Amino acid sequence: MSGSGRKDFDVKHILRLRWKLFSHPSPSTGGPAGGGCLQQDGSGSFEHWGPSQSRLLKSQERSGVSTFWKKPSSSSSSSSSPSSSSSSFNPLNGTLLPVATRLQQGAPGQGTQQPARTLFYVESLEEEVVPGMDFPGPHEKGLVLQELKVEPDNSSQATGEGCGHRLSSTGHSMTPQSDLDSSSSEEFYQAVHHAEQTFRKMESYLKQQQLCDVILIVGNRKIPAHRLVLSSVSDYFAAMFTSDVCEAKQEEIKMEGIDPNALWDLVQFAYTGCLELKEDTIENLLAAACLLQLPQVVEVCCHFLMKLLHPSNCLGIRAFADAQGCIELMKVAHSYTMENIMEVIRNQEFLLLPAEELHKLLASDDVNVPDEETIFHALMMWVKYDMQSRCNDLSMLLAFIRLPLLPPQILADLENHALFKNDLECQKLILEAMKYHLLPERRTLMQSPRTKPRKSTVGTLYAVGGMDNNKGATTIEKYDLRTNLWIQAGMMNGRRLQFGVAVIDDKLFVIGGRDGLKTLNTVECYNPKTKTWTVLPPMSTHRHGLGVTVLEGPIYAVGGHDGWSYLNTVERWDPQSQQWTFVASMSIARSTVGVAALNGKLYSVGGRDGSSCLSSMEYYDPHTNKWNMCAPMCKRRGGVGVATCDGFLYAVGGHDAPASNHCSRLLDYVERYDPKTDTWTMVAPLSMPRDAVGVCLLGDRLYAVGGYDGQTYLNTMESYDPQTNEWTQMASLNIGRAGACVVVIKQP
């Protein structure tokens, strides 16, 4: 018997079996399913011919070669053996079985070479496929190998066992002159579920504790396993078992710093690929996976924890992810904490934070709070939770509170507070904040990290309407500094171009403009919270290209064009009476004018007067109801963007001549006006020319939004830092806009 348990037949036994079973007459010539036939040779005896033998005989007869399938004579039977590469008839069940045989022939005088064979496991057979029989000899003139095809094995059961494919190569005609080693019939088999079946077998060995070659000891628990399986999924075990360390040869390995149940779960995962994730065990499992270097398990555990994030646990998950080196999980948990800080500070985890972790929260610009007062009260709540031990950390933590941005009433109360009056460092911080409020003209000299507002406290930047590729944008976008993203916030009631926008009580007031056919005097109010529009009383004058701003409560509509002429008139809207009234007119008619409020005065900058662009600037004093001329800008500008920052007025971009003038240029110049000295100074230019650019202050930086560069309506935005005198590219709008009105709402 062979090692596989199947019976091996010698050549004589095969011949006797064939002769006994097939030596009977058959009336038919044989078909694909009808078995073989008996043919009479020249000596008058009969022998059986199967379909494959018949084809082989005909092929050899065409070549003038006597077939070796004919019954050999007694003189040659002892020195010959049959050989084939065909489908052999199985007398046990009447099916044709593929037999692949590599015929090998040595050089003359070297004797007969043993045939190479490929065996297939066929589930319906009880005996191994009978190999082909080789009759090498000088009487063989040639042999045609049967063409074999790819046959899927459809005999597999529902379990998947025995699934696979047989791949057979095409045979070639071989003659005595050909090299029999170079022409062969080969078959290739690939089991579809081989790896799965193998690991199932290994799992059964694990359950029965068979062939285990290592025992992992953790605590009082011993876990048997197979080194090969563990090292195939874990880089930790692979390094241990393949390196020159003592554990590589030890049968028992002690594991430290790992939960026994988590280790057992991961050992089972190595065999099965299955893992159960539970909220109460996920941290132990993730810690073990990080130690054993199982990146796939680490990833799924991290995603599971991301789904569990809540204001009551996000601080703990963030700290745990940081300790385990799970960078992505830590980032997600940190972002969640920053976004939901208002709910986080109400939970027990916040009160239990160590001082080192708390200071990271207090120092962050990204905490989503409405004002600095919220962060200050959170610190005081944390200190009072364990006042005796935490008072020593108070001065260190108070330095991360932006005290200059607190209301002066709170600062006055802190000076004599029991927690602060005996702490010298706290007193210094409080005094610094008071100076910031008492000396506003010196604030530019007092800039520090404590005077920089947090991103969430500066409000939201809105871009309304403007000219786009569709001849007029009707969408409203808003920009969140904390996330650095633009999203659509609403829609206008209709198309408006060259209009103005002001903000009162966190509402947008859209004033004047033109709709493409006529100049408008209409006014509408948009509430971002309810996303509703309200119609307000119209202006007395139709205006497009006007400037709009808020000065000490009322809205001012300055200059513009009424469809016939350039205007120098100015109207003021009182939010209490909801009426428009005229105030003093400007010295010069101005359209596409830039306006801004600074130090209780209304400034009107540049613009066009009908013949040229203007460099002049004048300001309006509401207390005297008069306009006064100021020092002119260095450049003439129409379509200029204007905003104020730290007591200075900035003029940004624009054009220096009407578009009809072939010498017209679009500008990237930026100028700064100091009202104390009545002088203009050139500062860092924009990264590109921007005409009809929208400019406003957000936090401690100026933002230049959209515009026109001569070819494209721009969707880009850049911010200017007065401290570094540099422009920085920021997130882009969703669409390009020129002449968009940009404003900031503190509480969107």
From Swiss-Prot:
Annotated PROSITE patterns: BTB
Give the Kelch repeat ranges. Answer: 460-506, 507-553, 555-600, 601-647, 649-700, 701-747
Report if keyword tRNA-binding is assigned.
no
GO MF terms listed in the record are: actin binding; ubiquitin-like ligase-substrate adaptor activity
Q: Give one Pfam family, short name only.
A: BTB
Q: Where is the composition biased (Polar residues)?
A: 51-66, 167-182
Q: Biased-composition ranges for Low complexity? A: 72-88
Where is it expressed, tissue-wise? Highly expressed in brain.
> Sorted alphabetically, which CDD domains does this protein's record hold?
BACK_KLHL1, BTB_POZ_KLHL1
Write out the entry's keywords from A to Z.
Answer: Actin-binding, Cytoplasm, Cytoskeleton, Kelch repeat, Repeat
**Which Gene Ontology cellular-component terms appear in the entry?**
Cul3-RING ubiquitin ligase complex; cytoplasm; cytoskeleton; dendrite; neuronal cell body
Cysteine pairings via disulfide bonds: none
Task: Show the segment(s) annotated as Disordered.
Answer: 22-93, 151-182
Record domain BTB: where: 212-279
Q: Which domain of life is it from?
A: Eukaryota
List, alphabetically, the SMART domains matched. BACK, BTB, Kelch
Q: What does this protein do?
A: May play a role in organizing the actin cytoskeleton of the brain cells.
What is the name of the protein in this document? Kelch-like protein 1
Q: Which organism is it from?
A: Homo sapiens
